[in-house]
């Protein structure tokens, strides 16, 4: 089966690898986003899918745009793929592309559609504190994740899962379901989504990383594990941005009349902070302009003590 693969992040690269390992699939072209400046030094960096594809000597293209890109349309028509596989590519496909392959464009989406349609289903399901999610293999149409369902399977979200671990699990499941779908593509009966049950997973805004001590411990923890890759969670301390790199929920009693944000205790493993309904333990921190520190080094470096208020 001749395939064009469209994808960008590690999640997609893992699935591409599984496709390459299947001898009946011939990856004719890999389409990914353009290289982008990354980090403080703004170093031009290729997306993970490009790096992976080049290791296997696959043909790679990186169009700046899809809509109205006649040159790119002609490239696809010349290849004449039986299917275009789309995994976290990052752009909506125009009708001209959807109509090219014999079996259409097949998307691997990291949620149980119609729930969590959109760009950030893994982050949003973690932020919402859900304990179940999954993968949907969908035949794409012109809408945002509105196409017919070809295959679907759910998995449990563990309490200690974060965006990194859950992405890996879903990527593995996505590869398995995609391969199963492609092998049986001519026999699968598509199922329409129930639009009345649709929920949405819009892109993450950097501002969503800011937490407040007036939030509950679970809210803060869910945001921490959802936004661990980007933008991370942070608060403001003495007018500077304070990033929280590692944390956990803790327990202490007799917290009535204690102001949220108060440091309740300091030990070898972390700083205990009062929040809306309990306590969190800060284990690794970084103040704006400084380096990442263990809680112990942070306490020593900034002369923090029990009873101080982090604000």
Curated annotation (Swiss-Prot):
It comes from the Bacteria. One of its GO terms (cellular component) is cytosol. (6S)-5,6,7,8-tetrahydrofolate binds at residues 111-114. The keyword Protein biosynthesis applies. Its EC number is 2.1.2.9. It catalyses: L-methionyl-tRNA(fMet) + (6R)-10-formyltetrahydrofolate = N-formyl-L-methionyl-tRNA(fMet) + (6S)-5,6,7,8-tetrahydrofolate + H(+). Keywords: Protein biosynthesis, Transferase. This is Methionyl-tRNA formyltransferase.
